[in-house]
């Protein structure tokens, strides 16, 4: 079943895949990485002016990585804001997704965290570097195939 946004995108020839609705009735769409930046700009112009959340997850060991965006359309005088969930899947061997930092500035630290934990490179992000782990850390801790090191260095707070 397609939602209103999926129908609107299809009428304009924008390639996507409808993933149905989540348990709260929020429409979920899948966008290819190469189409994501253009569709993000279109969604912003269409009225999705607030990026509520960006996160990423490992679909399965050896499988795809996903970057998830929850967008909200906030309008003056409208009590119930429209929401949409966008999922962009990428290969784990060279995980690259266009950054939407220049569309929604609030994605800055969220994309950096996804890079730090899963190794997804967000192309054209102005400050893509580790944010939680030390720069010297090897690997991506939230990947399902990550092997934790046998040691952890604990530093005094003094």
UniProtKB/Swiss-Prot annotation:
GO BP terms, alphabetized: photosynthesis, light reaction
Pfam families: Complex1_30kDa (PF00329)
Subunit structure, interactors included: NDH is composed of at least 16 different subunits, 5 of which are encoded in the nucleus.
GO molecular function, one term: NADH dehydrogenase (ubiquinone) activity
Designated name of the protein: NAD(P)H-quinone oxidoreductase subunit J, chloroplastic
Family: Belongs to the complex I 30 kDa subunit family.
Predominant localisation class: plastid
GO cellular component: chloroplast thylakoid membrane
Catalytic reaction equation(s): a plastoquinone + NADH + (n+1) H(+)(in) = a plastoquinol + NAD(+) + n H(+)(out); a plastoquinone + NADPH + (n+1) H(+)(in) = a plastoquinol + NADP(+) + n H(+)(out)
EC number(s) stated in the UniProt entry for this protein: 7.1.1.-
UniProt lineage: Eukaryota, Viridiplantae, Streptophyta, Embryophyta, Tracheophyta
Keyword Thylakoid set for record: yes
Keywords carried by this UniProt record: Chloroplast, Membrane, NAD, NADP, Plastid, Plastoquinone, Quinone, Thylakoid, Translocase, Transport
Function: NDH shuttles electrons from NAD(P)H:plastoquinone, via FMN and iron-sulfur (Fe-S) centers, to quinones in the photosynthetic chain and possibly in a chloroplast respiratory chain. The immediate electron acceptor for the enzyme in this species is believed to be plastoquinone. Couples the redox reaction to proton translocation, and thus conserves the redox energy in a proton gradient.
Compartments reported by the entry: Plastid, Chloroplast thylakoid membrane
Signal peptide: none
Superkingdom of this protein's organism: Eukaryota
Membrane-protein topology: Peripheral membrane protein
Claim: NAD is one of the keywords in the record: yes
């Amino acid at each position: 079943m397609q939602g209103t946004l999926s129908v609107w995108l299809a009428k304009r020839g924008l390639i996507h895949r409808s993933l149905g609705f989540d348990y709260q009735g929020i429409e979920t769409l899948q966008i290819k990485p190469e189409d994501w930046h253009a569709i993000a700009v279109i969604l912003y112009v269409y009225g999705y002016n607030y990026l509520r959340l960006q996160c990423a997850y490992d679909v399965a060991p050896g499988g795809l990585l996903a970057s998830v965006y929850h967008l909200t359309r906030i309008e003056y005088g409208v009590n119930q804001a429209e929401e949409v969930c966008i999922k962009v899947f990428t290969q784990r061997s060279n995980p690259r997704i266009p950054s939407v930092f220049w569309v929604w500035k609030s994605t800055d630290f969220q994309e950096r965290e996804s890079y730090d934990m899963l190794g997804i490179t967000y192309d054209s992000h102005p400050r893509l570097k580790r944010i939680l782990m030390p720069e010297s850390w090897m690997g991506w801790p939230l990947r399902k195939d990550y092997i934790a090191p046998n040691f952890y260095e604990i530093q005094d707070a003094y």
